């Protein structure tokens, strides 16, 4: 990954970590505990830090919530989590989750993985949503089953698949839905990846590296309080965390697709 790409990705993440997004989205499963008891909503992570083994639910949230490091008198988290890990509510006698996963909004299925073993996401689905401010992409990962196909139109609440534990580093006890809401970085991603990658790209432009995660957690909390929210206005009203200098001749597709980021 080039320094330019890293800087752009960091800037976009910072710009998007704001408490309002402007679209009335549904929660993707029957788990509604986010608003009253988040410890029952987020799936825990296993943590071994300074000799203590814990299972904090906070590690399932969006943002820098993983890989704690002690820096002097404080603890900082080095790993960014780009989505929300949602606990299942239903399991069969063997403990296998049964929860239905549904589209958060109307859209078109953009991508469904062919197999579960070619990504850390496991089996995942991407749905494109067009709300008049550039295309947004919701992503649903670690699914046991997918019930839709690419190109299929879906409505808010349409069943997409079944919650599972596919993907690396996840076992039955930590089964969960990883859900994201993303911006699309570049249609030239495949060429960029091929020029420097040492492993194959099995997912084309819907590789997770080409999707920039928004703060979906903050959106749901803000929407719960005030459904009348506007993403472009919220971004313009937010203080910039980074300023990135880009050569004038550079072609930045993300700004063409989402001019309200400026």
Tell where the protein language model's regions lie, with residue ranges:
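Bacterial N-terminal signal peptides that target proteins for export
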Residues: 1-10
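Zn2+-dependent peptidoglycan hydrolase active-site motif and core
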Residues: 96-98, 102-145, 172-178
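Conserved, short, structured surface segments that act as functional micro-motifs
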Residues: 118-128, 142, 152-227
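Sec/Tat signal peptide C-region and signal peptidase I cleavage site
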Residues: 18-22
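Surface-exposed, glycine-biased beta-strand/turn segments
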Residues: 23-123, 202-262
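Surface-exposed strand-loop junctions at beta-sheet edges and helix termini
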Residues: 104, 148-149, 154
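Bacterial N-terminal signal peptides
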Residues: 9-17
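Small beta-barrel nucleic-acid-binding modules, principally OB-folds
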Residues: 80-93, 134, 141, 181, ...
């Amino acid at each position: 990954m080039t320094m330019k790409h890293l800087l752009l990705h960091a800037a976009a993440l910072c710009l998007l970590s704001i408490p309002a997004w402007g679209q009335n989205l549904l929660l993707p499963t029957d788990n509604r505990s986010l608003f009253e008891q988040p410890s029952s909503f987020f799936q825990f992570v296993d943590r071994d830090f300074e000799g203590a083994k814990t299972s904090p639910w906070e590690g399932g949230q969006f943002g820098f919530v993983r890989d704690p490091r002690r820096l002097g008198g404080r603890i900082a988290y080095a790993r960014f989590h780009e989505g929300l890990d949602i606990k299942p509510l239903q399991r069969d006698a063997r403990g296998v989750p049964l929860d239905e996963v549904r589209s958060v909004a109307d859209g078109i299925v953009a991508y469904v993985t062919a197999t579960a073993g070619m990504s850390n996401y496991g089996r995942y689905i991407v749905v494109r949503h067009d709300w008049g401010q550039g295309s947004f992409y919701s992503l649903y990962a670690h699914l046991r089953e997918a019930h839709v196909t690419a190109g299929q139109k879906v409505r808010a609440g349409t069943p997409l698949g079944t919650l599972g534990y596919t993907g690396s580093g996840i076992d039955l006890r930590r089964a969960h839905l990883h859900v994201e809401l993303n911006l699309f970085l570049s249609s030239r991603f495949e060429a960029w990846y091929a020029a420097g990658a040492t492993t194959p790209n099995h997912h084309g432009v819907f590789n997770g590296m080409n999707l920039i995660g928004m703060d979906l957690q903050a959106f749901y909390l803000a929407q719960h309080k005030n459904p009348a929210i506007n993403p472009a206005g919220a971004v313009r009203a937010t203080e910039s965390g980074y300023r990135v200098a880009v050569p004038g001749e550079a072609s930045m597709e993300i700004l063409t697709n989402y001019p309200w980021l400026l």
